[in-house]
Regions:
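Conserved catalytic or regulatory cores that recognize and/or transform ribose-phosphate-containing ligands
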Residues: 1-145
Length: 145
């Protein structure tokens, strides 16, 4: 009998040694920056827009990580302040460092966005490529940069 302190019962068994597994064929991804607090219509509208733009990129074969699409529902679900840069900028930095480049969605408010500025500065300092995306137009040519 389990005491409950060990965590949940495992659902399945892991077969094989991780070291023996082949790496994923394409691990390259781009960081998708979108405005959030400055977006007209508020942060929920910004979240919806970010998800739509990320979806368009993914459908076009441009692999992206979008912090707003990922972090907004976490903030809402966990009762965290979605506008607190002291929480979210450091939480996003590991993904910025891992990304191959930055794609900035030129949605309303992007030029005033504190987050987009922070992301742009970090990618510029790292010497990583930066592309600008018009709404609804994934930068497919960026794949070959």
């Amino acid at each position: 009998m389990r005491s409950g302190l060990e965590g949940p019962e495992p659902i399945g068994r892991f077969i094989g040694d991780v070291k023996q597994r082949k790496p994923l064929a394409n691990t390259r991804f781009f960081y998708l920056a979108t405005p959030y607090s400055k977006y007209p219509g508020g942060i929920e509208a910004a979240f919806q827009m970010a998800c739509e733009q990320a979806g368009l990129c993914i459908a076009a074969g441009v692999h992206v990580y979008c912090p707003i699409a990922h972090m907004h529902p976490i903030a809402v679900r966990c009762g965290m302040d979605p506008l607190d840069h002291k929480i979210w900028l450091p939480a996003d930095e590991p993904m910025m460092h891992a990304a191959s480049g930055l794609i900035i969605v030129m949605a309303a408010g992007w030029e005033e966005s504190v987050g987009v500025k922070h992301e742009t500065d970090l990618f510029t300092r790292a010497g990583k490529p930066i592309a600008y995306m018009r709404m609804g137009m994934p930068p497919i040519g960026f794949l070959h940069a």
